A protein has these predicted regions:
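Interaction-mediating elements
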Residues: 1-203
Length: 203
């Protein structure tokens, strides 16, 4: 069985060789298995997407020699996409700062890469709704998420402004409602199960 003699990356500028190597399973000295090379190609692509390089493409080739097989990954990074700003509209009772703390999408800045990931938007929407529910706003919903992008030529990257449009709805509180129809538990027992006191927020 031929072994891998060397692994080479070509075309990468934004992500260093060491970090790329940490994200692949093959290494010099391993028996060459083409399916592992393809798996690693996918891992490298996932790494680029995670860092905001949505259009990165990666291909591979291998060269046989007496020493074994040299695996070459050809990388076309494309422009990165970062979040320049996160905005909220329709939020009255919850501040922008609080909502920003609840979502995984972060604005680019010092110590923050601000990588834009489309898949994070759905999770962010749910995180916002979940927070509103803990505050008793059980009708809260995200009406829309706007994504305005533009190319920053100076920084050679695409920048996105994300706007979450929120409909908060009414707040529900528990005002000592009498529970009827229960024959097994006392009302007091049910209320303790619900962990709700008079005036407490209902969610």
């Amino acid at each position: 069985h031929p072994v891998i003699s060397e692994i080479v990356f070509k075309g990468n500028k934004k992500i260093r060789n060491n970090e790329l190597r940490e994200n692949i399973i093959i290494k010099p000295g391993d028996i060459f298995i083409e399916s592992n090379v393809l798996l690693d190609e996918r891992s490298l692509r996932d790494l680029y997407i995670k860092k905001g390089f949505m259009n990165a493409t990666i291909t591979n080739s291998f060269v046989e020699s007496e020493d074994g097989i040299k695996v070459i990954y050809f990388i076309n990074e494309g422009a990165s996409t970062v979040i320049s700003e996160v905005r909220f509209e329709g939020n009255v009772v919850v501040s922008d700062k609080t909502l920003k703390g609840k979502i995984s999408s972060k604005e680019v800045g010092f110590l923050k890469d601000g990588a834009f990931q489309k898949t994070a938007i759905e999770a962010d929407k749910q995180a916002i709704i979940n927070y509103y529910m803990t505050r008793g706003y059980i009708d809260a919903r995200i009406v829309d998420v706007l994504q305005d992008s533009y190319f920053n030529a100076e920084k050679e990257r695409t920048e996105v402004i994300i706007t979450f449009i929120i409909q908060e709805g009414a707040q529900y509180t528990f005002n000592g409602l009498t529970i009827t129809g229960n024959e097994i538990f006392t009302t007091e027992k049910l209320e303790s199960f619900m962990k709700l006191k008079k005036g407490a927020v209902f969610n």
